Amino acid sequence: MSKTIAINAGSSSLKWQLYQMPEEAVLAQGIIERIGLKDSISTVKYDGKKEEQILDIHDHTEAVKILLNDLIHFGIIAAYDEITGVGHRVVAGGELFKESVVVNDKVLEQIEELSVLAPLHNPGAAAGIRAFRDILPDITSVCVFDTSFHTSMAKHTYLYPIPQKYYTDYKVRKYGAHGTSHKYVAQEAAKMLGRPLEELKLITAHIGNGVSITANYHGKSVDTSMGFTPLAGPMMGTRSGDIDPAIIPYLIEQDPELKDAADVVNMLNKKSGLSGVSGISSDMRDIEAGLQEDNPDAVLAYNIFIDRIKKCIGQYFAVLNGADALVFTAGMGENAPLMRQDVIGGLTWFGMDIDPEKNVFGYRGDISTPESKVKVLVISTDEELCIARDVERLKNTK
């Protein structure tokens, strides 16, 4: 038996989960926040307990040392050599990585070069990879890329209708994101439906603070809503989603606070979406509270959100020429029954109908009625388990 750590490292955080493999049992999980800042926080959950420490953690190497020491201190492992593999989530793999890979010096260098495609994510992932390689150099490190699942898209789908030199010279194209989540819930949907994935047409809706929707044909991604970056697609928690690109130079001309394109993109990424329109929050629970209070800005934000998601799902029915099931996953997808109800309410023409008694908070499974031609499923995503599985598969191929 072996133990594998799944890592999701950001610029100032390191989220982790420890598995017993191949049993896929979760032994512990936690997160280290505010890396590089004063009063960093390390949280460890195991055996029904929760331990929290306030520390000064200067970089990812210190964070990894604290994580490993905590595993021993709390008796979760007896020695480092019980850990046989580490899997790292990497947002952008570009066209270089069509599947998960074992890390070597060249892979790490390429991940850092691809930071231009995910400047908020890839540098943190690279820092986490370096830290584990420095501290545990003899164990297998594997990179699992958010974009890999979407490399099956056809060229006419992933290219933008701009001069091709921008793709040839600068690799401007649709890459997508959340691929690990979309892959996992599609596999789970096939099990739930009792049919081979290779026979199914699925639309998977990952609706959390980030939102992406994918058309899955026979187990492969044929289209997805996120694009060159995770800013594209429907409205999200703090991201605008798709807008007319001519808005960007217009805002630079009109608003003295927006000095250049980077300022506008920052606004579109961090100050837009549900948060920007409502002026309340990026959290759907706060938006729904605003609905109860008849807050007009909350109502407007909610209506735009529902409208954009319905439109995206509808276009993927056209891409797939129909679908066997629609899958909701991630924070809002799993835990916002009102949102699911209102999205489906605009898609009944496609033959979808949900059972109100099943469409409640906390329910997982098939929420459609027996008469529904298209099944509607709620499935909890598990990107960490996908990462651990890939480590188990690849760790003997070094």
UniProtKB/Swiss-Prot annotation:
Active site: 146
The EC number(s) this enzyme carries: 2.7.2.1
Protein source organism: Streptococcus pyogenes serotype M1
Cofactor: Mg(2+); Mn(2+)
Protein keywords: ATP-binding, Cytoplasm, Kinase, Magnesium, Metal-binding, Nucleotide-binding, Transferase
Role, per record: Catalyzes the formation of acetyl phosphate from acetate and ATP. Can also catalyze the reverse reaction.
CDD domains, sorted: ASKHA_NBD_AcK_PK
Catalytic activity: acetate + ATP = acetyl phosphate + ADP
Biological processes, Gene Ontology terms: acetate metabolic process; acetyl-CoA biosynthetic process
A GO term, aspect molecular function: acetate kinase activity
Full protein name: Acetate kinase
Subcellular location: Cytoplasm
Binding site for substrate: 89
Coarse class of the protein's main subcellular location: cytoplasm
Entries under InterPro entries matching the protein: Ac/propionate_kinase (IPR004372), Aliphatic_acid_kin_short-chain (IPR000890), Aliphatic_acid_kinase_CS (IPR023865), ATPase_NBD (IPR043129)
Family label: Belongs to the acetokinase family.
Pathway given in the UniProt record: Metabolic intermediate biosynthesis; acetyl-CoA biosynthesis; acetyl-CoA from acetate: step 1/2
Cofactor note: Mg(2+). Can also accept Mn(2+).
A single cellular component GO annotation: cytoplasm
Binding residues for Mg(2+): 8, 383
Complex and partners: Homodimer.
Pfam families (UniProt xref): Acetate_kinase
Gene symbol of the encoding locus: ackA
Residue numbers binding ATP: 15, 206-210, 283-285, 331-335
Chain positions of site Transition state stabilizer: 178, 239
